[in-house]
Curated annotation (Swiss-Prot):
Protein family (similarity comment): Belongs to the Mediator complex subunit 19 family.
InterPro entries on file: Mediator_Med19_met (IPR019403)
Biological process according to GO: positive regulation of transcription by RNA polymerase II
Comp. bias intervals (Basic residues): 171-184, 211-223
Signal peptide: none
Biased amino acid composition, Basic and acidic residues: 193-210
Assembly and binders: Component of the Mediator complex.
Origin organism lineage: Eukaryota, Metazoa, Chordata, Craniata, Vertebrata
GO MF annotations in UniProt: transcription coregulator activity
Protein name: Mediator of RNA polymerase II transcription subunit 19-A
Entry keyword annotation includes Nucleus: yes
Biased composition (Polar residues): 1-15, 232-242
KW rRNA-binding (keyword) present: no
Length: 242
């Protein structure tokens, strides 16, 4: 640290006077005699002990000059003038996400159309307005139709031939209805819904037995319940006998 200070402020700076000259006495005059009870300041200051025990301050080191200096900051490459995209090599990602996607040309969808259809028609004079205002000069490109070609435009008497009758007739649309499962006696039942008659007879035979069992269970529950009249009527009789 002293080397850095010497380089910054110079080595030829005048050092402060030490000893009696620092106290304001002339070099020729002897220092005043101190009373015996007053000891020097360096001797009176007790040494401070650290964690390990050695002295942190020495009496002889109090008169040495010291300076509170900080190390110079390290130069930083990243400043406001640097481009962070090029610094971190993110040019490809920037072009991928931030670049505008070029739309496909119209000629890619309509390759059979002649001319330059990608550019507007005002440039090459192929717009509809330019064709109306300045029609192109054509020669005898239109030739009259022959008699064989005109037969296609003539009206014929009589009904239409059978092969052309159904061309203009549209088939009726099928009405979509909700399918309801109704059983019609005339329709045959599918195999899944067909049941054996023996099973139906067994179910009918078991129905009265099941009803009897349910009635017996209800009677047993009513007997054991406290609301049953037979149970409440038997309790006072038992108490009277006791």
């Amino acid at each position: 640290m002293t080397e850095i200070f010497s380089t910054l402020f110079g080595q030829n700076d005048a050092q402060p006077p030490s000893g009696p000259a620092a106290l304001g006495f002339a070099p020729g005059k002897p220092p005043p005699s101190m009373p015996p009870n007053q000891a020097p300041i360096a001797a009176q200051m007790p040494g401070q002990l650290g964690d390990d025990g050695p002295l942190l301050r020495k009496p002889g080191a109090m008169n040495e000059p010291f300076y509170l200096l900080r190390e110079l900051p390290v130069g930083n490459d990243l400043t406001g003038n640097t481009n962070l995209i090029t610094h971190y090599n993110l040019e490809h990602a920037y072009n991928k996400f931030c670049g505008k996607k070029v739309k496909e040309k119209l000629s890619n969808f309509l390759p059979e159309l002649p001319g330059m259809i990608d550019c507007p028609g005002v440039q090459d004079g192929s717009s509809l307005r330019s064709l109306i205002e300045k029609p192109p000069v054509c020669g005898n490109s239109f030739s009259p139709l022959t008699g064989a070609l005109l037969t296609g435009f003539r009206l014929h008497t009589g009904p239409l031939p059978e092969q052309y009758r159904l061309m203009h007739i549209q088939p009726p649309k099928k009405k979509s209805k909700h399918k309801h499962r109704h059983h019609h006696p005339q329709d045959p039942l599918p195999l899944e819904t067909r049941t054996d008659p023996t099973k139906k007879k067994k179910k009918k035979d078991n129905e009265p037995e099941r009803r009897k069992k349910k009635k017996d269970k209800k009677k047993k529950k009513n007997r054991h319940s406290p609301d049953h009249p037979g149970v409440t009527g038997s309790q006072p009789n038992s108490n009277s006998l006791r």
